[in-house]
A protein has these predicted regions:
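Contiguous, often N-terminal, cationic amphipathic patches that form binding interfaces
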Residues: 1-81, 86, 98, 104-121
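Glycine-rich active-site/cofactor-binding loop and its immediate structural neighborhood
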Residues: 93
């Protein structure tokens, strides 16, 4: 009987990888987003390990009322940045609610750059 309780608890835990993939998927599927940006230390991690950080462009912390998420992005040239930021927040909240039923306190969006397409002449 104790084993069933332990298995149920284990099944209900959210892995960091699943959480980050859910957030990253919601962000990159948002219209106007070119890519996730880089947090300080992401390139350092990659340099030492040779692997990309799962946390690329995403910082997560616990707040008093729920989870606080900082998301760093590069947007496409010509988009209305406030709309893109709002849509990222909406998409991430929806994805996390749908997938994990989590209480989100804040989602902060930081625009790190604007991607432009080079025209060859």
């Amino acid at each position: 009987m104790g084993t069933n309780h332990d298995e149920k608890t284990k099944d209900n835990r959210i892995t960091e990888e699943a959480f980050l993939q859910c957030v990253a998927g919601a962000v990159t599927e948002t219209r106007g987003v070119y890519s996730l940006g880089e947090r300080m230390g992401d390139s350092l991690y990659q340099g030492f390990t040779g692997r990309r950080s799962l946390r690329k462009g995403i910082k997560v912390a616990r707040g008093g009322k729920g989870i606080i998420i900082d998301i760093f992005v590069v947007v496409e040239y010509g988009v209305h940045i406030p709309d893109v930021a709002f849509n990222i927040q909406t998409n991430v909240k929806h994805a996390l609610k749908e997938e994990f039923d989590l209480k989100i306190e804040t989602i902060n969006i930081q625009i790190q750059g604007v991607h432009t397409t080079r025209i060859k002449r």
